[in-house]
Amino acid sequence: MASYSTNDFKPGLKFIQDGEPCVIVENEFVKPGKGQAFTRTKIRKLISGKVLEINFKSGTSVEAADVVDYNYTYSYKDEDFWYFMHPETFEQISVDEKALGDNDKWLVDQAECIITLWNGSAISVTPPNFVELEVVETDPGLKGDTAGTGGKPATLSTGAVVRVPLFVQIGEVIRVDTRSGEYVSRVK
């Protein structure tokens, strides 16, 4: 198996720490006035999502993680699993709720998602950055009612709830940023 030295560390590098795949979020080389140089890293564990700060002595090596990202198209959901299809090979993969997390509220038919695989099993699903969803429930926007925040909650066709401007009505299709869960615009 391949390994990385602390000299190879950079944000986005994936390696094994305590038997779990991790990705480097930040790293900094530190050379104190006295003592051995070290690399201060902030890592995120890909399965549990925990963020840790770990110091590695200069020259230490870590085992590379066999983690691969693939583009898949969302197909359908049954009781326990969500199914995705590879757009070129038409191979299907099933993903459980643990790997999907709370991203199920952004899945629409034929959405292009990035699935992260480790040892052949899915560990995370990243939905597209922007999705277009229909507003199925929201309060009517009253004219001149801008004393508050200027927004109102709206329930979308997938069950997600986002804050929208007062002019958005039931039945309209809106664009939502899935990374922040915020309203972007109406779709014409």
Curated annotation (Swiss-Prot):
Q: What is its main location?
A: cytoplasm
The answer to whether the entry has keyword Protein biosynthesis is yes
Judging by the UniProt lineage, the source's domain of life is Bacteria
Key word Cytoplasm present: yes
Annotated localization: Cytoplasm
Q: Which residues carry the post-translational modification N6-(3,6-diaminohexanoyl)-5-hydroxylysine, per the record?
A: 34
- Processing after translation: May be beta-lysylated on the epsilon-amino group of Lys-34 by the combined action of EpmA and EpmB, and then hydroxylated on the C5 position of the same residue by EpmC (if this protein is present). Lysylation is critical for the stimulatory effect of EF-P on peptide-bond formation. The lysylation moiety may extend toward the peptidyltransferase center and stabilize the terminal 3-CCA end of the tRNA. Hydroxylation of the C5 position on Lys-34 may allow additional potential stabilizing hydrogen-bond interactions with the P-tRNA.
GO biological processes? peptide biosynthetic process
Pathway per the UniProt entry: Protein biosynthesis; polypeptide chain elongation
Q: Write one Gene Ontology MF term.
A: translation elongation factor activity
Q: Which UniProt keywords apply?
A: Cytoplasm, Elongation factor, Hydroxylation, Protein biosynthesis
Name the Pfam families for this protein: EFP, EFP_N, Elong-fact-P_C
Looking up InterPro entries in the UniProt record yields: Elong-fact-P_C (IPR015365), NA-bd_OB-fold (IPR012340), Rib_uL2_dom2 (IPR014722), Transl_elong_fac_P/YeiP (IPR020599), Transl_elong_KOW-like (IPR013185), Transl_elong_P/YeiP_cen (IPR001059), Transl_elong_P/YeiP_CS (IPR013852), Transl_elongation_fac_P (IPR011768)
> Which is one Gene Ontology cellular component term of this protein?
cytoplasm
Q: So what family is this one in?
A: Belongs to the elongation factor P family.
Stated role = Involved in peptide bond synthesis. Alleviates ribosome stalling that occurs when 3 or more consecutive Pro residues or the sequence PPG is present in a protein, possibly by augmenting the peptidyl transferase activity of the ribosome. Modification of Lys-34 is required for alleviation.
Record's protein name: Elongation factor P
